[in-house]
Curated annotation (Swiss-Prot):
It comes from Bacillus phage SP01 (Bacteriophage SP01). It comes from the Viruses. This is Gene 33 protein. Disulfide bonds: none annotated.
Length: 101
């Protein structure tokens, strides 16, 4: 009887075998991070549907939840570079799109 009660307690106690960092979303984010880390330095076309802008960007870095992109801008007598971040959630939902060369 005690063995049965111990097994029942294990089934009801979800914190024992539950790992927050092993959920489906975390596995997806880790996969995307590994994918984008291989693409660092490559050029891509970034399309944002909410602001209706598209830019040619360079992938700078990949982190746990987002990637860092940069693009150059030019003026009459100046030139610069701007960095921006895009979350994996925006890429997965279709709000943003990144087409790598």
């Amino acid at each position: 009887m005690q063995k049965f009660l111990d097994e029942l307690e294990k089934v009801r106690n979800h914190t024992e075998d539950y790992d927050v960092y092993n959920s489906e979303a975390e596995r997806t984010f880790r996969g995307l991070k590994a994918k984008f880390q291989k693409l660092i330095g490559k050029r891509a076309l970034y399309i944002c549907k909410s602001t209706k802008e598209s830019r040619v960007v360079t992938i700078e870095a990949a982190y746990d939840r987002y990637i860092v992109l940069s693009y150059k801008y030019y003026g009459m007598d100046y030139e610069g570079s701007t960095k921006m971040s895009v979350t994996y959630q925006a890429l997965l939902s279709g709000e943003d799109r990144l087409d790598v060369e």
